[in-house]
C-alpha cells in the first residue's frame, strides 16, 4: 500500500471539516470510565464497609494486597482525569454551540448531574 493511497483512504472518512483535538476527550472519557470501573471493582473486593474496620481495610489494600497501592492511586488520579475530561468535553460543546441542540444538551446535563451525585455519594457514604 503506497503512502499516497493511504492518505487518500484517510481523507475519505466521514468527518466534518471542523474536527480538532477537542473531539478526543469524548473517547478519553470512555477510557477513564473503564479504568475507574476496573480499579473500583478490584478495590471493592478488598474493602470492608464496617465503620470500625474501614481504615484497617484501606491499610490492608495499601500494604498487603499485591499492587494495591497502584490500584488506589490509579483510581484516585483516574477520577480527577475523568472530571477534567468531562469539563473539557462540555467546554467543547459550548464553544461549538452544541447547546442549541436541546435534546442532546439536556441529556448530557442530566448525565452530568447524575455523575456528580454518584461521585458525591460514593465519597461521602462509603464508610456507612
From Swiss-Prot:
The record's remark on the cofactor is: Binds 2 heme b groups non-covalently.
InterPro entries cross-referenced by the UniProt entry? Cyt_b/b6_N, Cytb/b6-like_sf, Di-haem_cyt_TM
Chief place of localization: mitochondrion
- PROSITE patterns (UniProt xref): CYTB_NTER (PS51002)
**Pfam families, per database record:** Cytochrome_B (PF00033)
Query: Which keywords does this chain's UniProt record carry?
Result: Electron transport, Heme, Iron, Membrane, Metal-binding, Mitochondrion, Mitochondrion inner membrane, Respiratory chain, Transmembrane, Transmembrane helix, Transport, Ubiquinone
User: Which residues are involved in binding heme b b566?
Assistant: 89
Which sequence ranges are marked TM in the entry? 25-45, 69-90, 105-125
Q: Which residues are listed for a ubiquinone binding in this entry?
A: 126
Q: Name one GO cellular component term.
A: mitochondrial inner membrane
- Cofactor entry: heme b
Q: Which GO terms describe its biological process?
A: mitochondrial electron transport, ubiquinol to cytochrome c
Q: Name one GO molecular function term.
A: ubiquinol-cytochrome-c reductase activity
Protein task: Component of the ubiquinol-cytochrome c reductase complex (complex III or cytochrome b-c1 complex) that is part of the mitochondrial respiratory chain. The b-c1 complex mediates electron transfer from ubiquinol to cytochrome c. Contributes to the generation of a proton gradient across the mitochondrial membrane that is then used for ATP synthesis.
PANTHER family (alphabetical) = CYTOCHROME B (PTHR19271:SF16)
User: What assembly does the database describe for this protein?
Assistant: The cytochrome bc1 complex contains 3 respiratory subunits (MT-CYB, CYC1 and UQCRFS1), 2 core proteins (UQCRC1 and UQCRC2) and probably 6 low-molecular weight proteins.
Q: What is this protein called?
A: Cytochrome b
Lineage, top ranks: Eukaryota, Metazoa, Chordata, Craniata, Vertebrata
Amino acid at each position: 500500500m503506497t503512502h499516497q493511497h493511504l492518505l487518500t483512504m484517510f481523507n475519505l472518512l466521514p468527518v466534518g471539516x471542523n474536527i480538532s483535538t477537542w473531539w478526543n476527550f469524548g473517547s478519553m472519557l470512555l477510557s477513564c470510565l473503564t479504568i475507574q470501573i476496573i480499579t473500583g471493582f478490584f478495590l471493592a473486593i478488598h474493602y470492608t464497609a464496617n465503620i470500625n474496620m474501614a481504615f484497617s481495610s484501606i491499610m490492608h489494600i495499601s500494604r498487603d494486597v499485591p499492587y494495591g497501592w497502584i490500584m488506589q492511586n490509579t483510581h484516585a488520579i483516574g477520577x480527577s482525569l475523568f472530571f477534567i475530561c468531562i469539563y473539557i468535553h462540555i467546554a467543547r460543546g459550548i464553544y461549538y454551540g452544541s447547546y442549541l441542540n436541546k435534546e442532546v444538551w439536556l441529556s448530557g446535563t442530566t448525565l452530568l448531574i447524575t455523575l456528580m451525585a454518584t461521585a458525591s455519594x460514593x465519597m461521602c457514604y462509603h464508610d456507612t
